[in-house]
């Protein structure tokens, strides 16, 4: 049962990373090469880890720096179901794809434009995971 719980936690989190809802043809951005602060990488990696790791914060520090959501905001973010949420993330993926060119150098401007989006996706994943866990165990 622990394995299945870990799988659920991982799945709900991953479904909020835009590149996990990306195009099959480019393996969710894995084949789209970009420069991240002069270092070669791919678009998937930027969204999977590079942006969030840029500030070198622990998960606890990152969580402490997120805005606290009101009950109304949590309720709004928990609306819908898994299909609704993945469709929402897919829409976000389209915006991410449109935000870069192959080989583009990404840096502070990209962070300025998209770090808040990445943080919001993390928050969505967390509050939606809470909804699913409450439905299962509540």
Language model segments and positions:
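Soluble secreted/lumenal catalytic domains
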Residues: 1-11, 15-31, 35-45, 54, ...
């Amino acid at each position: 049962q622990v394995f299945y719980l870990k799988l659920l936690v991982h799945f709900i989190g991953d479904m909020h990373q835009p590149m996990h809802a990306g195009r099959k043809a480019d393996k969710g951005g894995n084949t789209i090469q970009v420069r991240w602060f002069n270092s070669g990488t791919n678009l998937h990696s930027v969204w999977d880890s590079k942006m969030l790791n840029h500030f070198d914060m622990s998960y606890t520090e990152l969580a402490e720096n997120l805005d606290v959501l009101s009950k109304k905001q949590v309720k709004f973010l928990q609306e819908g179901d898994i299909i609704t949420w993945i469709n929402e993330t897919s829409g976000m993926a389209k915006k991410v794809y449109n935000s870069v060119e192959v080989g583009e150098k990404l840096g502070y401007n990209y962070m300025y434009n998209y770090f808040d989006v990445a943080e919001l996706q993390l928050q969505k994943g967390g509050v939606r995971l809470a909804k699913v866990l409450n439905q299962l165990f509540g």
